[in-house]
Amino acid sequence: MSAPNIDSQELAKWDPDLTARLIDAAGPVAKRWFRSQVRGLESFPAGGGALVVSNHSGGMLTPDVLLFAAAFYRKFGYDRPLYTLGHDALFVGPLSEWAGRIGLIRANREVAARALRTGGVVLVFPGGVYDSYRPTFTQNVVDFSGRTGYVRTAIEADAPIVPAVSIGGQESQLFLTRGTSLAKRLGLKRLRSDILPLTLGFPFGLSVIVPANLPLPTKIVTQALEPIDIAARFGDNPDIGDVDTYIRSVMQTALDRLARQRRFPVLG
């Protein structure tokens, strides 16, 4: 079977009715618990494909996905699909079918580019779990761990990049360390993991991924920034590194601004 057909089948799994039911059920709960605010959607492209590039927070829970999706669908409705790139572990066993139906697709450049070309909006967290488990004491640092594939995806699909930043998710518990050195010693790279994070939270206290602690009701604010047309800003043959540096710089400036507005940990 050809790759385009595989890509099409993966995108075709999206079920707007199921997605709406999930968002309607879980969205208000998450919004109240995290006192969520999503800003800047008024400048979001009104139609067509767009690649939303965001920092990732909250460890295993990563509430930023649900919070952004709920705000996105409130504004644009369910005629416009929002796909989120996910780790391969989400597509194993019975989870695979459910993942596709609510818009999760594999973190694969070809699949993402096809979604963008068909007019879908794609949400990507280039830093992945490396970012979502960053220490709380460095929570306001945009760190993609050198990953630049998102830039190539946007260029291949001729889609604008919409940078987005969120703050507060790393206060849902105390993220102590990614545990990269320990993961290396234990040879976890064979299992496609470069980290073995240590966190402190409620009710289990210290946790190494499991048992999963409950998230504190930290206030999470997400800011969508102005869309960036890569060709218009960087020309027809942009340097991937230059684009990545610029995107992260724009995001870091916005995250610094949100950090200055935040008065207290957890409370916001």
Predicted segments, located by residue:
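Catalytic core of membrane glycerolipid acyltransferases/transacylases, capturing the structured
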Residues: 46-112, 118, 128-145
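Non-catalytic C-terminal accessory region of glycerolipid acyltransferases
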Residues: 1-22, 114-268
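Hydrophobic alpha-helical segments of integral membrane proteins
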Residues: 22-29, 95-98
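Helix-to-loop junction immediately C-terminal to a conserved catalytic motif
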Residues: 25-56
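Pocket-edge structural micro-motifs
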Residues: 40, 54, 70, 86, ...
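Short, well-ordered coil/turn elements that cap or connect secondary structure elements
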Residues: 31-33, 79, 156
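A generic local structural motif
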Residues: 36-39, 71, 109-110, 209
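Hydrophobic pocket-lining residues within nucleotide cofactor-binding pockets
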Residues: 44, 57, 90, 166, ...
